């Protein structure tokens, strides 16, 4: 995997990891904590969607069509773009209030959750980025951590 990074506001670092053969980028945004010796927190989201069948939609699936009563329809908005936005809005609001986390927080967007994660996330966890930093918690769907 190749990688490159950009820094935003001198606090948030965004890294792009891409499997050169597949063109499926993993995006990791990092908010460095005040105590880097502590284990990191990883919040995961995905940017892929299940296949679209346009004839089953009232509005074009990728249009983010807003109805007169305020509903917005778009493929992937609930699974799972909204969660990634929640993460970033929470970070933005916490930073605005002057909050500094003790632990480093990584927000990830992976490209292939809907098809098993073998081309993106699986390759990303094999990189040096993960070594000694993160202990992912993986649960089966609908497990609710039971």
Q: Where are the predicted features?
A:
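Acidic/His- and Gly-rich active-site-bordering loop/insert found
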Residues: 1-75, 96-101
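Acidic/histidine-rich catalytic neighborhood of metal-dependent amide-processing enzymes
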Residues: 71, 78-146
């Amino acid at each position: 995997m190749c990688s490159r990074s950009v820094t935003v506001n001198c606090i948030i670092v965004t890294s792009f990891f891409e499997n050169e053969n597949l063109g499926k980028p993993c995006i990791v945004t990092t908010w460095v904590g005040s105590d880097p010796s502590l284990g990191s927190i990883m919040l995961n989201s995905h940017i892929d969607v299940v296949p679209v069948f346009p004839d089953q939609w009232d509005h074009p699936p990728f249009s983010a069509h807003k109805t007169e009563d305020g509903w917005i329809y778009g493929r992937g908005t609930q699974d799972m773009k909204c969660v990634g936005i929640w993460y970033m809005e929470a970070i933005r609001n916490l930073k605005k209030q002057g909050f500094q986390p003790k632990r480093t927080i990584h927000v990830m967007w992976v490209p292939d959750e809907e098809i098993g994660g073998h081309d993106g996330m699986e390759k990303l966890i094999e990189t040096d980025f993960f070594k000694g930093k993160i202990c992912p918690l993986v649960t089966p769907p609908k497990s609710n951590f039971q």
